């Protein structure tokens, strides 16, 4: 895949993200990924249990661990940043790797809470794979342990 082809794919994914955001905003819904740290608020959890590396269904990934980059993605993890951004360049490089011999090899890191997953590391890898129609993604998973589960 050439750089020009990767840029074309990024622009298509960007339009999908913009369209999704507009649709969700029109319905009065949050257009960005959910944020686990905000959901947990204060003291709901007593830690995380390492579950290991699993293939998880992409449809169960609903958010991110922390709020740091939520405005870079639509709720469905399509990109929202300008094509000239460093973010876009990295997304396009992953696109080229995915379509080339190299592939996307490294698992993402995510947290599982109440059956849903929240990405800590690997948002762009998830975005590229989802854009290309992947249904599962390798992930290092940590399960959030709620206070009442430890009693």
Where are these regions (language model features)?
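Conserved small/polar residues in nucleotide/adenosyl-binding loops
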Residues: 149-150
